Amino acid sequence: MKIVVVGGGTSGLLSALALEKEGHDVLVLEKDKVGGLCRSENIDGYTVDIGVHAITMLNDGPLTRLLNNYARYIPNFREYGDYYVRTDKLQKIPVSMNEWMT
């Protein structure tokens, strides 16, 4: 069966991959850049991440199951903890509303 997937972001690409592995003839249409909001750009000589900055539920989430079933290459996900960079210092991201308030 011929199938058109509209959108080459993470969901569209993973859907196309799964459909292709099931034997379908798949065409992905993307108006901008493949990867959607999950990509890096070179701006004034600096590599800047655009879009997704965290991927969760890697132990047994849907992304891991799709990659395990359909991908040729399984990325090595490393856990860095719940931190972000602000003014050259690492700041812990609060996990509860009470932590946000203090």
UniProtKB/Swiss-Prot annotation:
**Superkingdom of the organism of origin:** Archaea
Q: Which Pfam families does the protein's record reference?
A: NAD_binding_8
Q: Which SUPFAM superfamilies match?
A: FAD/NAD(P)-binding domain (SSF51905)
Enumerate the InterPro entries for this protein.
FAD/NAD-bd_sf (IPR036188)
Q: Can you name this protein?
A: Uncharacterized protein in nifH2 3'region
Q: Which organism is it from?
A: Methanothermococcus thermolithotrophicus
